[in-house]
Amino acid sequence: MSSTLSEGQTLIKKSLSPSKATSTNNKGHVFVEPQTPLKNSNKASTSEAALPETLKIMGPLTTPTKVLDAPSSDPWTPTSNLKMLISAASPEIRNREKERAVDSSESENSQETEQGEEVEKLHISRKDKSLGLLCYKFLARYPNYPNPALNNGISLDDVAAELHVERRRIYDIMNVLESLNMVSRLAKNRYTWHGRVKLAQTLAVLKRAGKENRYEQLMQQIRQRSQEREEREFDLDGEEKENEEMSSFEVDGDSGLADLPGADSKAASANSRKDKSLRVMSQKFVMLFLVSSPPVVSLDVAAKILIGEDHVVDQDKNKFKTKIRRLYDIANVLSSLELIKKVHVTEDKGRKPAFKWTGPEDIPSPKDLEISTTSSAPKPLESRSSVENCAKNLFSSPGTKRGFTRHHSLVKLVKSIQDDRRKINSAPSSPIKMTGDSADSDFYTTKMAHLAAICKKHLDEQSADGRPNNAVTDSSQSSKQPESTSASNHGPPGMQIPVLPAGAISYLPTKCSPIIPLLIPQHQTGGPYAVYMHPTSLRPQPTSLAVRSMTFESPVGANAKTSPATLTSNNQTNQSSSYGKEQTSPVNLKRASGEKSSVGSPSKMQRTEPKSVSPKLCEILQARLKARRGALTSNRPSARALHLEFSKPSESQPTVQTGTASLEHSLETFLEKEEKSQTSDNEAGLTPVRQPHSQPQKLSAPFQDMVLPSGPIHTETLIPAGYLIPISQQSIVNFREPQCSNESSKASTPTYNIYHTPTAGSRPAFPQEVTPTRLPLHRIPPISPFPSHGHRLHSPSPAILNFTLQNLGLIPGSVTPNPHTPEQSSSLQSPHPGLPHQGMIFVKPMSPARALQQTSIHGQPVTLISIPQALVTTPKGGQAFQQSFFHTPVSFPTVNTTAPKKIYIPQRKLDVSPEEI
């Protein structure tokens, strides 16, 4: 601090010395500095040489005079010294302050100049940015009729920069031009210029749309209402009526929007944003000029029609004024295009702004313009791709972006598809249980709705395997369709089954159908089959010399000469009296509806006069059959078919001789007749028939051991008219019946249960018990029409079989049989062993494990199980009348009983087991 003060004092002394000198000079007192003698001459010479220089600088060397009593302006105080010190120590601070002052002054001047320039700019842009002037400048950049071969693209960014305006102002111009098809949108901020090339066509379309929307009538009504409103300003009722009328004439967006390029069909309603866009309002505004008779439209009328918010004027005036400004923008652009001009309309309250149409007045129809443009206009689009040429409207342009609109119905379609897919995905998908043969072979479902389709599919697969159907007679070739309806029936109950040569099982019906029956060939899969047999009540009257026989074919050579037994009908002299009795018996009812269905069926052959058939005709048919048989036996594979052969009685063939016994023939009588036929079997080279070693009277279901010949099997297949229905292994169930009081010595073994269809009779049928094993079976006599034990049966159920057979036309929908007398009902209790008069046959191929190769039918013997159907009977004594009810079959509880004596039955044989009722 001391050093600083000393320096400050020296500076003060230096600064004060010149002031003292001046003061002394002014007063005349001069101070002279004393001179000292020079010791050295050298020094003196040196000082003398430097003296003139110092004189020049310091002036004359005179001693200053001392100023006496000189008053000081500032007192010497510590504060003054401090001020002097601060001012001397901070010269740079003073410079900075001066610089800041200069900068602030310059900035103020610059701000004033900038504000002035901005004011000038705002004043200029307000004038230059008017939409009409901008539209004039914009149209001056492009020709009215451009060359389509050149690039006529427009970039809004470049145009806004060149015109020194905002891009939003250019958007207003482009929307109005796009509504008139003078430009088309290519991309964002990219447009294509078309000019006035399509202006006439656009105006024609707009004029047609305006007429369709009744704009002219609407304008007249608005003018009339406005005049009435002026007269009744204070009438509230008049205003309400006006609002109602206005609402009835409001135009929605779809009708007001013309089908123009860029006029998107998605502009839906009058309240939508798209409908009130500048482009759509511009189209409607032009429509008003084109349809009005004096082409002058006031702005308020146009606002009421286009904006459609006249009733909201009092509620929101600012909103309505904003939309009025949009109409002004449209009018300014149209004025720049020289289509309209502004005028004033004088009314009662004064002048109102209006616009008059100055554009083309004679506008042709759109069709004429289309014809002229297609014939004369150049075609620059031919070189472009087909996608670009596919436009959604009349005004397609080269290079424009195509916008395809999704129709609203597609949205509903997509929703419905999604709902269906959701239902399918949410449906239960439990696996199907497949057991036994169903997993290995063709699986047949147990559902009723699919059984008929599965049977048809099975037949189609058989035909697709390349196995040709076995040919039948010439008369049966025209009737190969499997439409054997209820007219294809067979014999009555009590008929016998004699053993015939050539391994053919011949059924001798007394009442035969004149129609040729046909059994559908089935695919040989080893599975069981159910053969449906038609009821007696639907069978037609028999014809003479008609014989049906059944066999299962096997490939034989052309030298097969054996033929099935030819049997005569009941009009021959050697026919048994029992059959004659059966023919005249009232049990054999006349057909009810079979004859009608057979007459109208073109796929069947009918003989009009059955009794007039002569043996000569039968010989001709038999000769033709034999001639065709020799040609077809070599190339026919093993398939099952049904053939009909007409023949006369042969002397070499044995005839069946029966007495006048009743229908209650015993099995012994039947076996005795079979022994008589063994002689003919030996002559034909057949294996003798083996009788079962048991008492047939004790068997409820007797069996017949039918051994087929060891030689070639005959190719003729004859069976009573029926159908083979494939049955899966699920339908084969095992059950045991409880022991009966009167049949306690009989045992129950696993059996196959087949149930008849409840269509022919009114009483419930009972299960048929047949087994291919060596154990006999017994049956409990029925106590009540309701089964006391359930049957376990998976497939097929009687309802399924009824459904399938009725759909295929095999059985009628409902049959009401005629009642019988007690004598007639008693005759049905024990029919003769043979094919029953009605019911179903269950065909079960047996296992080919045994070595009886001569009995195999393509390696698989069959077992015929017939289920008769009962008819309505008159109750005897105190028996209650039994009604027919359908019960779902379920399984019986098993009961172990005493097994009777076993009967040896060869496995490879053909067993026919009737049932006693």
UniProtKB/Swiss-Prot annotation:
Gene Ontology biological-process annotations: cell cycle comprising mitosis without cytokinesis; chorionic trophoblast cell differentiation; hepatocyte differentiation; lymphangiogenesis; motor neuron axon guidance; negative regulation of cytokinesis; negative regulation of DNA-templated transcription; negative regulation of transcription by RNA polymerase II
Compositional bias ranges of the Low complexity kind: 475-488, 568-578
Cellular location(s): Nucleus
GO cellular component: RNA polymerase II transcription regulator complex
SUPFAM superfamilies attached to this UniProt entry: Winged helix' DNA-binding domain
Biased composition (Basic and acidic residues): 93-103
Ranges annotated as spanning the membrane: none
Swiss-Prot/TrEMBL keywords: Activator, Cell cycle, DNA-binding, Nucleus, Repressor, Transcription, Transcription regulation
Gene3D superfamilies given in the database record: Winged helix-like DNA-binding domain superfamily/Winged helix DNA-binding domain
Biased composition (Acidic residues): 105-117, 233-252
Keyword Cell division annotated: no
Comp. bias regions, Polar residues: 16-27, 37-48, 371-386, 595-605, 815-830
Molecular-function annotations in GO: DNA binding; DNA-binding transcription factor activity; DNA-binding transcription factor activity, RNA polymerase II-specific; DNA-binding transcription repressor activity; RNA polymerase II cis-regulatory region sequence-specific DNA binding
Residues covered by region (Disordered): 1-122, 221-252, 353-386, 461-497, 556-615, 671-698, 813-834
Top-level taxon: Eukaryota
Function text: Atypical E2F transcription factor that participates in various processes such as angiogenesis and polyploidization of specialized cells. Mainly acts as a transcription repressor that binds DNA independently of DP proteins and specifically recognizes the E2 recognition site 5'-TTTC[CG]CGC-3'. Directly represses transcription of classical E2F transcription factors such as e2f1. Acts as a regulator of S-phase by recognizing and binding the E2-related site 5'-TTCCCGCC-3' and mediating repression of G1/S-regulated genes.
Record's comment describing the protein's domains: In contrast to classical members of the E2F transcription factor, atypical members contain 2 DNA-binding domains and regulate transcription in a DP-independent manner. Both DNA-binding domains are required for DNA-binding and are proposed to form an intramolecular structure that is similar to the winged helix structure of the E2F-DP heterodimer.
Family under the similarity heading: Belongs to the E2F/DP family.
Name of the protein described by the UniProt record: Transcription factor E2F8
Lineage, top ranks: Eukaryota, Metazoa, Chordata, Craniata, Vertebrata
